[in-house]
Amino acid sequence: SFRHFGTTKAGTPVDIIEEVADADVRVGLGNVEYHYFAGYSGGAKAIMPGCSTFEAIQANHSLMLSPEAHAGNMESPVRLDLEEACRMVGLDFIVNVVLDEDRHIVYAAAGDFVAAQRDACHHLDDLYGCELHEEADIVVVSQGGAPKDLNLYQLQKALDNAKHPVRDGGTIVLVGSCQEGFGQPTFEQWMREAVTPHEVVKRLKKTFVLGGHKAAAVAQIEERCDIYLVSDMPDAEVRAAFMTPFATVQEALDAARAKTLRELGRAPRMLVMPHGGSNVPLMRF
């Protein structure tokens, strides 16, 4: 059963499992990595969503449609809502770590659940963040290869990181095997049932559904730029996801270059992200 602590300003019910609510001391453990709408993981997430109800998670995650809810933003409205909920419950101490690509601990921060988490975030930025001072016309991005790109649901993480540096009207060349297709039933259903990407976003605004939330995250990107997908997915499935299928990266790149030249009358500015699931462009302009 759960204990009710109140409601956040954003309307998230703070309902926490009784064993945690009744504890004399609460200590949170976790790792800090980029999160595509909470900004970063770690910190307050040990309590919310870690020890909360499905309804609370849905309410908090519905804030993901805010323009400020993106990877690399320590003040994401999703993050701030989590921390407000955590203050209502109380989290006495945390230990948050940063991992390298081989899952080895390279940094640890401990103490207050906000201050220690922010400390770990800054260290994560030093390792995996990349400062950029202008947008690109074309971004070529890969999740980093198997087993991180088995389906489109997984590939969404790299796609979301690539959205930051691409200009409005630009092109993202997304590369991944996607041999398992869409990879998640609700994600696939929402894509197939929509006529336009905007319909997917509107659907999530009306009713938040896990799985559908990733479809909406992809659709938001598709509303502002083109996505060329180089994968093993059948062309019809790629088009059902509102993307353009290509057999090779070279073919996709040639098409993206031609599009830029046609629309802007100049050679494109390009960015390549071979480990797009791990690296986040930090836009500084």
Predicted segments with their positions:
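Structural motif
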Residues: 27-29, 138-142, 173, 271-272
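Short, glycine-rich nucleotide/cofactor-binding loops
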Residues: 144-154
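Mobile "lid/hinge" segments at catalytic clefts and subdomain interfaces of large enzymes
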Residues: 32-33, 41-95
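Short helix/loop capping segments that flank catalytic or ligand/cofactor-binding pockets
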Residues: 29, 35-38, 56-59, 104, ...
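A generic local secondary-structure boundary/capping motif
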Residues: 14-23, 35-36, 48, 82-86, ...
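An acidic, phosphate/nucleotide-engaging active-site surface
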Residues: 1-40
